[in-house]
A protein has these predicted regions:
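Short alpha-helical transmembrane segments in multi-pass integral membrane proteins
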Residues: 1-22, 80-147, 178-181, 187-248, ...
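Transmembrane helical elements of multi-pass membrane transporters/channels
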Residues: 20-39, 141, 152, 175, ...
């Protein structure tokens, strides 16, 4: 049933409602790196370094592709949450159809353009002829997972936007579980090598897309499907494309920031590069936890905007930040005190260990400096204030480069970490600074 347009729909936001989304999504995000470890382990059993290098390079190429298309998940979450908050069932259903349609179009484009994409990727990343041959084999098969993988982004975003975090967790667990099982089966038992890892991914994405379709059909059971006119509504389709475009630019800026960090690390020599790579992995682990709370902020802020209910928006912002800082503080303490043990577990090279420990304090502080960026990104995605998020990301990237230009000549690798910290902090505080104004514009009839 669709409510009257513009009607205020009050609802409560509590710590329980925040954690009900954050905890399942954190578990879902944490299951993803396990897949990479298993793929590496099963190929490692074949005893061929070129095969390991092949799936590593292929994995990086697809990480870039799918990270770029993450707007399908994030944008769908925000639009669905707003439709749910407004009680607009027709639009809520239409968002899913638009997102899946766009996912399929983009996915088939990846298949069509796979050869030039692979050629460009190999040119940029290099590798021995043996590694490039393995990468080519992996890429040629896994490319066919693109329409399925992107459709799964759409399903995931839609269920999260509806507040169905446990369903999203189930889909992600289903995907990674099947992928792991099939990788072991295809590589170790069928002896398909790198092709087996790629085929396992295609099969797992297909099974997950099927599961997502079934679950979505159940959710839509008994309700009228959106008409062609509703799905292709020019204004709403244009809004979705603008939102996705802004998130895409933001994603490219984020990729650029991390690529710059690693390139500047490499310029300092292999030891510093290895040490910084280990410390960056610690930050990435923290990001999986913080992303869970950011996803909760997306859904609740989006729902509040759709419901036109400012108190729920303010409450979702406050609670997600409180829980975010609590979690970030705990992670920072773990990294600070257990960091040396983690570093020793990740490398046996003594020189790398010493350098990593020397800069550990920076990595331990990144969750505290970055949590505001994660949470504000979630709020702005949910509220679909994507243009502001894009602009503040570009501003933060410029400040990052400026900070590096000043700090690195004076402080060396400490200066690089300082610049990265400035980047994280700038993202969060720049968005926070304009939140009040954007909220007043979005909730004009309600007191601040």
């Amino acid at each position: 049933m669709t409510s009257q347009p513009g009607a205020v729909r009050p609802f409560d936001v509590t710590s329980r409602s925040v954690l009900a989304i954050a905890v399942p999504m954190t578990l879902a995000y944490l299951s993803t790196p396990l897949l990479g470890l298993v793929d590496t382990a099963v190929i490692g059993q074949l005893g061929d370094a070129a095969l390991l290098g092949g799936i590593a390079l292929g994995g990086v190429l697809f990480d870039i592709v799918f990270t770029s298309f993450n707007f399908l998940r994030a944008g769908t979450t925000g639009l669905t949450a707003q439709a749910a908050g407004a009680g607009d069932g027709e639009e809520e259903r239409a968002v899913l159809f638009r997102a899946v349609l766009l996912a399929l179009v983009l996915g088939f484009a990846v298949i069509v353009l796979q050869q030039p994409a692979l050629t460009a990727g190999l040119w940029l990343m290099g590798g021995s002829p043996e590694v490039q041959a393995a990468t080519t084999s992996y890429f040629a098969i896994r490319a066919f997972s693109a329409p399925l993988a992107l459709a799964n982004y759409a399903f995931l975003g839609w269920f999260i936007g509806r507040g169905r975090a446990m369903t999203a967790l189930g889909l992600q667990t289903w995907l990674n579980g099947f992928n792991i099982a099939l990788s072991v089966l295809f590589v170790l038992y069928f002896e398909w090598g790198v092709a087996g890892v790629a085929a396992a991914t295609v099969a797992a994405e297909a099974l997950t897309a099927l599961a997502g379709t079934v679950l979505a059909a159940r959710a839509l059971s008994g309700r009228p499907l959106p008409t062609r006119v509703q799905v292709f509504d020019k204004v709403r389709f244009k809004r979705m494309m603008a939102l996705n475009g802004d998130i895409l630019v933001r994603s490219f800026a984020l990729i650029t920031a991390f690529a710059f960090f690693m390139s500047r690390s490499a310029a300092q020599g292999d030891t510093v590069l290895a040490a910084n790579a280990i410390l960056e992995k610690l930050f990435m682990v923290a990001s999986f936890f913080l992303d869970g709370l950011a996803t909760a902020a997306e859904q609740l802020a989006g729902r509040a905007v759709g419901a036109r209910y400012r108190p729920a928006f303010d409450r979702s912002l406050k609670l997600s930040l409180v829980w975010g800082y609590v979690l970030a503080g705990l992670i920072s303490l773990v990294f600070f005190f257990a960091g040396p043990l983690l570093i020793h577990a990740m490398t046996t090279a003594e020189d790398v260990r010493q350098v990593a420990i020397a800069y550990l304090s920076w990595a331990a502080a990144t969750p505290l400096f970055g949590v505001l960026a994660f949470q504000m990104d979630g709020v702005f995605i949910g509220a679909t204030w994507s243009r502001d998020m894009r602009n503040m990301m570009l501003l933060s990237l410029a400040l990052y480069f400026a900070a590096y230009a000043v700090a690195f000549p004076l402080l060396g690798n400490h200066g690089l970490w300082l610049a990265f910290t400035v980047f994280l902090a700038a993202r969060g505080f720049s968005l926070l600074a304009i939140t009040g104004r954007r909220a007043r514009e979005t909730f004009p009839a309600l007191p601040a």
